Amino acid sequence: MAGKKKSLVAPRTLKGFQDFLPGDALLRAAVIRRIQAIFELYGYSPVETPALEHMDVLLGAGGEETNKELFRLESPEEDPIALRFDLTVPFARLMAQYPEQIKAPFRRYAMGPVWRADKPGPGRFRQFTQVDIDAAGAATVS
């Protein structure tokens, strides 16, 4: 063992992903707080859903194009699951899953990371923050 050097792992970020160092992270947090305050001023409530969803829930009737964008995984129970590619599909699942707790009209917002397994490019990332706002069952958005 003496004389053998451990090889170091080269630190690197996956293609299509990015780190936010303190300056950028603080700016992003300030922008998010401002957006949240505006949404809440207009009567929208925050909702959070898991980053992972069942594959059939995410695909629904989304077709082949959506299918290509998924980061696929398998749960410990061997169920097909994937990282969410947007925040709207999980919201639709939430509305269908909790009809007694969530009554229309329901105004909600969500912010968080989403993942798409498409080709990254300038300004196009595989993980990015999405801001989503919906007025379910409301005649108007205000």
Residue ranges and their predicted role:
Residues 2-142:
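TRNA-recognition modules of translation machinery and tRNA-sensing kinases, especially anticodon-binding
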